[in-house]
Amino acid sequence: MTKPSQPIKIIFFDIDETLYVKSKTYIPDSITQQVIPQLKEKGIIPAIATGRNFGGFPQALKPLIGEHGFELFVTINGQYNFYKDKMISQYGLTIAQIERCIEKLNALGIAYAFVTPEEIAVSEENPIVRAATAPIKTDYVVDPKFYLKSTAVQMLAFYPESRDEEIRASGLLLDELKAVRWNQNAVDILRIENSKARGIEDVIRHFGLNIENAMAFGDGFNDLEMFDTVGFSVAMGNAEEELKQRADYVTKHIEEDGILYALKEFKIL
């Protein structure tokens, strides 16, 4: 069994289906009562690394935010990163990129959204938009010109996997942007060089650590670059198969206390 090569000093956790069971809207007790308190006691930094913006964090996570829990955040796929209330780094789309996306998506009849560090603004309301955003944010703004009022770090586009090839052929992405699927009817649209990995590298430098001191837990496609970057990666038992293949270790399912199991297995806790 592969083991971490260096002492683990910081651990990055994805939110959905890693820390948080989205379908049942809860965080396992093993995380709230054992994992986070014990990491803090040992001086290991627990950090969030998520595709969500801070304004879209689930309510169940809120009690774990603060000096006794999470104070370090890699959000919006590494594009807005902060410690306590201090920003470490921010990346985003240019106005030209946003307006090209709007033009292409309008021509394709696809609804879209703008994501800022705190808000999500959708171009229109429809059943697909409501279903996709329901687990992350219900109090979104409806405003197709929102990007002119507030800096949009990334966009969302609401279309099924069956349209993936059509989107690739449309010229929407070119060689500047990428689409990362997080829902059967929704993708993140971001600059091709941006990912959780970029945010993690910024955070590691900020704290004067080495990447070998970093561990990460995840389950989805937006965790692939993160797994390639950190010193040791752990895929949840419920993770996408491609991520499991990329991981250094595959632990148990989220509802089988997979995070606690792995940390005990490697004697980190």
Segments the model singles out, each with a brief description of its role:
Residues 30-128:
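Active-site phosphate-binding/coordination module
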Residues 68-69, 172-175, 229-230, 245-247:
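Short, structured coil segments at secondary-structure junctions
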Residues 100, 104, 108-217, 221-226, ...:
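Conserved acidic, metal-coordinating active-site core of Asp-based
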Residues 7-25:
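Asp-based phosphoryl-transfer active-site loop
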Residues 2, 6-10, 188-269:
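Mg2+-dependent phosphoryl-transfer enzymes with acidic/Ser/Thr/Gly-rich catalytic loops
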Residues 43-47, 70, 153-155, 212-214, ...:
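Short active-site oxyanion
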Residues 19-22, 81-85, 188:
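A short acidic, helix-capping loop that chelates divalent metal ions and anchors anionic groups
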Residues 25-44, 90-97, 194-205, 213, ...:
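Short, acidic loop-to-helix structural element flanking the phosphoryl-transfer center
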